[in-house]
Amino acid sequence: MAIRLATREEAPRLADIIRAAFRDVAERFGLTAETAPTHPSLCTAAWVGRAMDKGVTYYLGEDGARAWGCIALERATPDVCYLERLAVLPEFRRKGLGKALVDHVLNEARALGARRVEIGIVAAHRELKDWYLRLGFRAIKTVRFEHLPFAVMFMGRALQGD
C-alpha cells in the first residue's frame, strides 16, 4: 500500500473516489444536490482541479494499480493546515488505511512547518468524531452555517511536541 502525490490529470480519479467514499454519509444524513450542493458525495473533477489551482495538495493511496483512497492538505496560514477530503473506498475500510492517509498529511504538514492541522466534519457523525479523537484531534467548536443542513464540528491537532 503506497501513498503518493496526485497529479492534476488524476482529478477525475480523485473525484470518483471521493464521491464513492462519501455516498454513505450523504445517504445517512439525507444530503442531496438540493440540500448540500457542495458535499463531497457530489464531488467533480472540476472541483478537485479548482482546489489544486488554489494550492490544495492531493495524495492518492494505491495498492498496485488499484486506488483505494485519497486525502488533501491545504495550507491555510503558515501555522495551520487543513486536512480535507479524506476518502477510503468502502471495500478498503477498517484496515488502517484512513489512519495511514491522516498520518501522511500530518507528516507533510510538519514538513511545511505547520503547528496545527484542522478539519471540519458533520457534527452529528459521532463515529467519525470519535475516530478523530483517537487520532489525537480535539473538538474546537461546532458551527451552524445557513447554507448547510447540518452543523459542522471543527477539530484540530497540534503538531509540535507530539
What are these regions (language model features)?
Residues 1-3:
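Extreme N-terminal starter segment of soluble prokaryotic enzymes
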Residues 5-11, 15-91, 102-108, 112, ...:
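Acetyl-CoA-dependent GNAT
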Residues 78-80, 116, 152:
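A generic structural signal for beta-strand entry/edge sites
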Residues 88, 122-123:
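Short amphipathic helical patch at the helix-1/turn junction of helix-turn-helix
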Residues 96-98:
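Conserved G/P- and acidic residue-centered "switch" motifs that form tight phosphate/ATP-binding loops
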Residues 101, 125-128:
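Conserved short alpha-helix immediately C-terminal to the canonical SAM/SAH-binding motif I
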Residues 118-122, 129, 133, 138-154:
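Conserved catalytic-core motifs of GNAT/GCN5-like acyltransferases
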